[in-house]
Amino acid sequence: MRSPRTFTFYFLLLVICSSEAALSTPTEPIVQPSILQEHELAGEELLRPKRAAAAGDRVAEEYMVDIEISFENVSFLESIRAHLNNLSFPIRGTEADILNIAMTTVCTPAGNDLLCFCEKGYQWSEERCLHSLTCQDYDSALPGGYCSCLKGLPPQGPFCQLPEAFITLKLKVRLNIGFQEDLKNTSSALYRSYKTDLERAFRAGYRTLPGFRSVTVTQFTKGSVVVNYVVRVTSAPLPGSIHKANEQVIQNLNHTYKMDYNSFQGTPSNETKFTVIPEFIFEGDNVTLECETEFVTSNTSWYYGEKRSDIQNSDKYSIHTTVINNISLITRLTIYNFTQHDAGMYGCNVTLDIFEYGTVRKLDVTPIRILAKEERKVVCDNHPISLNCCSENIANWSSIEWKQEGKISILGNPESDLESSCSTYTLKADGTQCPSGSSGTTVIYTCEFVSAYGARGSKNIAVTFTSVANLTITRDPISVSEGQSFSITCLSDVSSFDEVYWNTSAGIKIHPRFYTMRRYQDGAESVLMVKTSTREWNGTYHCIFRYKNSYSIATKDVTVHPLPLVSDIMMDPLEASGLCTSSHQFKCCVEEDAGEEYAVTFHVDSSSFPAEREVIGKQACYTYSLPANLPRCPKDIAVFCHFTNAANSSVRSPSMKLKLIPRENVTCQDPIIGIGDPGKVIQKLCQFSGVYGSPGQAIGGTVTYKCVGTQWKEESRACISAPINGLLQVAKALIKSPTQDQKLPTYLRDLSVSAGKEEQDIRSSPGSLGAIISILDLLSTVPTQVNSEMMRDILATINVILDKSALNSWEKLLQQQSNQSSQFLHSVERFSQALQLGDSTPPFLAHPNVQMKSMVIKRGHPQIYQQQFIFKDSDLWGDVAIDECQLGNLQPDSSIVTVAFPTLKAILAQDVQRKTSSNSLVMTTTVSHNIVKPFRISMTFKNNHRSGGKPQCVFWNFSLANNTGGWDSSGCSVEDDGRDNRDRVFCKCNHLTSFSILMSPDSPDPGSLLKILLDIISYIGLGFSIVSLAACLVVEAMVWKSVTKNRTSYMRHICIVNIAFCLLIADIWFIVAGAIHDGRYPLNETACVAATFFIHFFYLSVFFWMLTLGLMLFYRLIFILHDASKSTQKAIAFSLGYGCPLIISSITVGVTQPQEVYMRKNACWLNWEDTRALLAFAIPALIIVVVNVSITVVVITKILRPSIGDKPGKQEKSSLFQISKSIGVLTPLLGLTWGFGLATVIQGSNAVFHIIFTLLNAFQGLFILLFGCLWDQKVQEALLHKFSLSRWSSQHSKSTSIGSSTPVFSMSSPISRRFNNLFGKTGTYNVSTPETTSSSLENSSSAYSLLN
């Protein structure tokens, strides 16, 4: 028996040979099984054309041949599959080619049966499925879908076939008979009868359609009887074929069904293909819509929008129809320059017989999105810079173009990648293309994307070209000596740059506070300025202008020659007494410098003498001996030493004083201290007193001696140990160093280590203690940020000096320098404000004598700040809290730092020790950023005095006691926390201000009796003023017609009304400002600026209206023959009264507010300390007072000595005289008011000036009502006339007729006479300006404590 492989080979060879033989012989016997099936379905007429063609011109035809292969071994199946897959097609023959061989059907035995499966992609025909037994019917467990497998091979083809693409025609027709309900039931006999008859008729009629396959009735509905059915065909109907088929249906259907021929309706589905080109539409594209059908017709159309507007050929649209092979049709609509307005629904209609083919598509415009950096800066240094453009859109781009527009033309090299939708334009500009004159010129480069369909999208890139800066630096060599100043000027010819800085030769940046920078239109300038040079400034310095990655550098060498500073020269003696018959030695010592020897001379009177040099330890000492037997005695001699270095720079020491006395006056004598008479007090440097170590050590400080009896007694000692003194000298040099911020961390570490080693000396020596305080004060002024490690070193040093064992040294130190404790606290607060925690965890730093806690404010995550401090050794505790609302007003990333001290209370303000004082913590809380709004803080202290006394919450005010500092209770109060616990005191603090701040830059001490008195006067006076001014305006309104009958009276009352109105508004704004900065409402910066502006404006308006009144009087008396109209006078008056104040107040706020120095930090009034903006109010007011006084003198003189012919009418003279009275009284009052205001400016002025100033200003409104309004005789008469009864009128007439009745406020009344005698018959009182009496808390500490 042959092997399977041999059998397979012979079989395939047979297939191929048989195929080739078949292609050379008549084909009819071989293809018969295949074409018989075709003949049965489609009719004989379809086969004949093929045969005619084959027998005629031998035109190439395609045949499908079914070959059946049988074999016994199932494993052959995979071998056949593999062999067929490896064949290469086509297989060429002499007269025919085999195009493809595909396996379609596989039958395998299953018991006694044969199961036939379709290969993937093939299926049994519907006819076979309906009339054959499927595998699932044989065994439901077999895999595969229904009808993918048949039981038994069909007796006569076809086998499995490729699935046909059917066209389903949905139709309906009406039967003109009555509808019966059984037609809804698919299992009823009536339904089956109708379905069978109709399908038979439909099949007979529609089988004439090309590619007909089946027809099925799907439903019967009402409307007579409406028959719904579907016809399945493989090709589109030909025109007119449906009508013919419908006629055949009518003919083949029983007439009893009464089918209505005109009721045939139909709509096909899935037969129209709609294409949009391009897929993504950009604005400007030419868009083509294609509608393709599988049939041919001439009835096509296009429409747009929901209203189905018909589209015709035009400039915008083009419609074109194409027939392909006479079997399909494509209609195209082209839309030119598609815009956003063209977007919407588009549809095509193709009509064939009773069918309407069509589809709809919505078209949208996609914006062209181009990514590019819109601004670039390019330095003309010949380095390539790339401009990049990329489109986010996936599109068929035809090109990417670059264009430029600008004053200068700099071309680049474009490179585009259309597949990635990106383009790069590389610029390489050099100095010749952008000279210095064109530096900063901007050129617009445009990248434009062009699609294959016409759309264009562009993006502009603004490129600013900057020339490389040419730097010019100070030419002259810089050679200075220590202590001298120098500056280096660096000029750039380019004004565009990103950064300017200075470097040392080691690459260390110099702190910006040492240099300035100014930018000009055509360049820039930076100046390095050093006020006090040290040896650390010796070296090379680089001026660097950076623009992007381009650097322009200029260098300058600086030579600093050593020269001792005056403060570094140690002298002996400072002052001394000596015998006339003895020689006396003078000594000047400086730190020994190996590289420099000074020429030193001693100067006595007008003579100079060379010095002798001696090195003692680390010091170089220069001495001179004054010879004995001077001609005159006693005599006072002043001696100083003069140092000259190699650069011929010199410095002289302070004078050493020697008093020559006879021997008989000497009672005290010591070889080191010297001689002296009783009561003599002298100072010696500790270095030369022999009280500290060896003479060569750099010991600081002084010792004071007093001659008592025959012995020198040491009165006080303020010596500084050598290590601490060395640190002090380094600290003084560090704050002048160019690299101070880099050196500060190392220095603070060394300071804490040295403080620990010298702990005993610091706590026992006031001098060393004072040196540490001076060091901390110096270092706290270094403008740099403090980190946690630096703060740790600072607190370690503070812990040493605040120990209880150092309290005696503190007391002695404060007796010598009373501000040292306040200075120490101030330096701690500066360090706390400079602390920057960043993202690190806030540290808790704890020592026995100081603790620190902190928090960082995060954006969007406000939380309560609450910290507690416990000092068990001191039996003290306290906590501080700031609520979430207050923290929300802080800038993000602000640091809040609280430092607590258990012993500082006993050190601060020694005068407190003389009172009953509560021993409590001192807690200082600082914020790293400026606080714009008032800040409320609450604290709780342990109460160690529960038995008696009233606790008082206080804060440290640095400005008290001539800036020595003191405890202040302003804005702090003891509150009830609801716990009823006498062991604790709950405090709330909110800084307040008082009213006298308006004119005086300084203010009375908060909480003092003077401050309270000024507050009371201000509030009462303002209340009276507001009521009086309102009453004045009401009175003027009532008597207006009676008192304004001539122009002079009219203008006078215009001025009085405006004065009263302006002062009333000013007083109201004054109260608003007081409410803001008194803390009743949060201090809003905008509200405070507004209050300051309106107070300034309306108070100035009061004075300018007063000036208007004076000038009007002057005009009426001097220019008698010139009479201006009312409208002219009013225009001038209002321009002067409101225009000038508006200009002054607007300029003031415009100039100062951008720098945030318009108003004070703690009050709503003009700034004094920073900008002297207060002068914008005081100077105009005082000038107006002087002018009005001068006018008053002239007017009174003119009235008393009238010229002939110049006398005005009686009524005019009465008005003028009344005005002179008003000016005469009002102006002196104003002058006195602001005279006292000037007095309050003087530092330490008497409290009487504050009281008088506040009294006169607060009651101005009342004075205006009395003297400016009610004292006017015409006003009195008008009021009496308006409110008198007939009886009173009769009596008044009678009294008037006999001349014995006078109004109570008339010039001749007794009361008026008293005023006339008092004021010299000059009239009424004029308007002054109220002052805020606010206490300045700008120098207040944030340290709080508790007083009892």
UniProtKB/Swiss-Prot annotation:
Outcome of gene disruption: Knockout mice are born at the expected Mendelian rate. They are viable and fertile, but display labored breathing by 4 months of age, weigh up to 25% less than wild-type littermates by 14 months and have a shortened lifespan. They exhibit abnormal bronchoalveolar lavage fluid, reminiscent of pulmonary alveolar proteinosis. This alteration of surfactant quality temporally precedes a massive accumulation of foamy macrophages, leading to severe pulmonary emphysema in aged animals. In addition, knockout mice show impairment of the blood-brain barrier.
Residue segments, region Tethered agonist: 993-1008
Site (Cleavage): 51-52, 223-224, 992-993
Effect of residue 995 to A: Complete inhibition of basal inositol monophosphate formation, when tested in transfected HEK293 cells; no effect on protein expression; no effect on location at the plasma membrane; no effect on the response to exogenously added agonistic peptide
Outcome after substituting residue 1240 to S: Exogenous ligand-mediated activation maintained, although with decreased efficacy compared to wild-type
S-S bonds: 291-348, 389-447, 490-543, 953-987, 972-989
Keywords for this protein: Autocatalytic cleavage, Cell membrane, Disulfide bond, Glycoprotein, Immunoglobulin domain, Membrane, Phosphoprotein, Repeat, Signal, Transmembrane, Transmembrane helix
Region of interest (Disordered), ranges: 1328-1348
Location relative to the cell: Cell membrane
PTM note: Highly glycosylated.
Membrane topology recorded in Swiss-Prot or TrEMBL: Multi-pass membrane protein
PANTHER family named in the record: ADHESION G PROTEIN-COUPLED RECEPTOR F5, IG-LIKE DOMAIN-CONTAINING PROTEIN
Self-association state and partner proteins as the record states: Homodimer; disulfide-linked. Heterodimer of 2 chains generated by proteolytic processing; the large extracellular N-terminal fragment and the membrane-bound C-terminal fragment predominantly remain associated and non-covalently linked. Fragment generates by the processing enzyme furin remains attached to the extracellular N-terminal fragment. Interacts (via N-terminal extracellular domain) with SFTPD.
Protein name: Adhesion G protein-coupled receptor F5
Lineage of origin: Eukaryota, Metazoa, Chordata, Craniata, Vertebrata
Gene assigned in the entry: Adgrf5
